[in-house]
Amino acid sequence: MKFTLSWLKDHLETDATLDEIVEKLTDIGLEVESVDDRAAFRAFTIARVLTATRHPDADKLQVLSVDTGDGKPVQVVCGAPNARAGLVGVLGRPGDYVPGLDVTLSVGKIRGVESFGMMCSERELELSDEHNGIIDLAENAPVGTSFAAYMGLDDPIIEIGLTPNRADCTGIRGIARDLAAAGLGTLKNTLPDAVKGEGETPVKVILDQDAGNPFCTGFALRMVKGVKNGPSPKWMQQRLKAIGLRPINALVDITNYVTFDQGRPLHVFDAAKVKGNLTVRTARDGETILALDQREYKLNAGMYVIADENGPESIAGIMGGEHSGCDENTVDVLIESALWDPRMIASTGRELGIVTDARYRFERGVDPEMMVPGAEIATKLVLELCGGQPTVLDVVGYKPHTARVIDFPVTEVKRLTGLDVSYEDAFDILKRLGFGVEGDGKTIRATVPSWRGDVEGKADLVEEVMRIHGINRIDPQPLPSHGAVNGRILTTLQIRTRHARRMLASRGMMEAVTYSFISEAQAKAFGGGKPELKLANPIAADMSDMRPSLLPGLLAAAQRNADRGFDDIALFEVSGIYEGDTPDKQRRVAGGVRRGTAKVEGAGRFWAGNAAPVGVFDAKADALAALEAAGAPVDRIQIEAGGPEWLHPGRSGTLKLGPKVVLGTFGEFHPDTLEALDVSGALCGFEVYLDAIPEPKAKSARTKPALSLSLFQSLKRDYAFVVDAAVEAGNVVKAVSSADKKLIVGVQVFDIFTGASLGEGKKSIAVEVLLQPQDRTLTDEDLEALSKQIVASVAKQTGGVLRG
């Protein structure tokens, strides 16, 4: 919403400066977005060129003698091609700042001739891009006066951002009312007396609508006969131009002026072009109208028009038709002021794609009590600017506004905002805002004015009191302190998410953020595709289902990188997957994909040899690292061979905690999965379920336990066991670890061997065992006894024997 300072002062009696007004507007919730104060133009004066002679030392320059109105001509050197004797232009004197050149003028010599100023072009004053010559004003322009005042450029332009509820401030009078209520002046009474008309309006208005659900709740029409339409006066044109409107003619400009001045949209018809009476009705399917924007619109039965016997003459409340528009030949004019259903206006405007100042106001809700005064204001302006004889104002379908009454306990202000506002202050604020007020010292009975349709309850009145009293008057309060140690801020799941994300990034993986929507084929390939997880209105055909896994998006991202030359890439994501349409079916998952040779130790070729393609063990290591970082008890995790159907059955695994709790899956992808997703290359991946990790036991103290380190040196022992080929290495590791859980602190497989020397169906698994004594150095007898325990444990759990 734009307006000029002088326009605001038509409604507000105030001595406040521009800065004070701007600051107060923001304080009361009418946030100022920009201020265009063209103060730089005030120094430039209108001057007449008395003589123009050729420069003695430059063919393209002229030496001008310029009259500034004080009887003392000024010498100026000028190179403009249109400089001539008699031209009236704009003079900048030494000390004046030229915004288009970003220079301050001074006395100078040009080719040996002194110049005491500069005749300016429009581009040099940033009025337009025109720079082919200096400004050429009308011959009767007042020489010696301020150019800014002459052109109306000395009036600052203020632009505010309105929230949708403040329909009352779509008119400058509403803004002035708020400023007056905030103590920045007095609101002027600018409403004119009713215009006395003679005779009835010959064109009648018929409301063809459902009386129980009307879309037009009032229609005022008046004819002014014998008008003389032409350009609007300079002051009106300057104001309309300042707010971004193009002056057209006096009749049209008046309607635009009243729209911004009062927030009251109007329309004018050329009475000679209207055939018969005006009927407010629904449009008929297939009807068309050529609107004032020179575009033809196709209407349907869900839209509303003002029509005559020729057909639609106006799209109700949005835009008039070209056929009945007013021009310089208009003699008799019909002035229309009506009330329209905001929902109807919004729906029609969206469907036709029309955005107008009238639609902007009607769909937010205009003041119903301004329908008749708006027509009177427009009539008065028409009579002043165009002459003519008005008829009696014809009002159809209007019912007086019924005001809403709200009982408002003043204590609500303190309860909702923390502001201490006295009963008297709250009473006075609401009264200044135009509310009808009465009360008993505790509760105010407030009658909502017609222009505040957004005020519906006590909370709205609290807001009104708060913004006028001053939000900046809320006393600052320190945040509450609950002791030396702050309470926990993040939830367990948030902590797990953060730790898993950091761990995967530290393993050389790059974080990706993929869509939660995937295609139906992708969803079904990863165990999804349930009807309840299909989107009702997908943004694209290949984004129709909520994802059951992170892997489809990560695989697609890896393939896109490979298609662009980045074959070796490792990606991860920590986000949600969806197993159903209830909140408990949304799970927090950390997933990752490695492609090509993107291993933890590096990718591609290096000095020690070519890197091998990624495989199942890379995915396993990533999954276990993420789980450990998230706080899972990895020493108790069981690894079962095989995984979901989208993973390779012989190169995948499932991570479990006990027989029922699944913590994750990992492995290489099934060839059918890669084919279905149209991806290729060496690929492995994993998913771990962060929400499946059991909650840690509550600690008795917030401090970490004391670090206990052994004083004795650790030692390692190697063992090789011959087991059946079907025995997994992990089972051997668990058997060794269980032999003595206090002494054995680490077990690692370092060799697997198969050969004829072991016998058919046999293999050798070699492990390194790390021992850490706690209370004494181990003797040979201790080591021998431990070895027997390890061999016995492996034999019992796997059937393996110590290799000779």
From Swiss-Prot:
GO terms of biological process kind: phenylalanyl-tRNA aminoacylation
Annotated disulfide bonds: none
Main localization category: cytoplasm
A GO molecular-function descriptor: magnesium ion binding
Catalysis: reaction(s): tRNA(Phe) + L-phenylalanine + ATP = L-phenylalanyl-tRNA(Phe) + AMP + diphosphate + H(+)
Domain called tRNA-binding: residue spans: 38-148
PROSITE patterns listed in its UniProt record: B5 (PS51483), FDX_ACB (PS51447), TRBD (PS50886)
Entry similarity comment: Belongs to the phenylalanyl-tRNA synthetase beta subunit family. Type 1 subfamily.
Subunit details: Tetramer of two alpha and two beta subunits.
Protein name: Phenylalanine--tRNA ligase beta subunit
Species whose genome carries this gene: Brucella abortus (strain 2308)
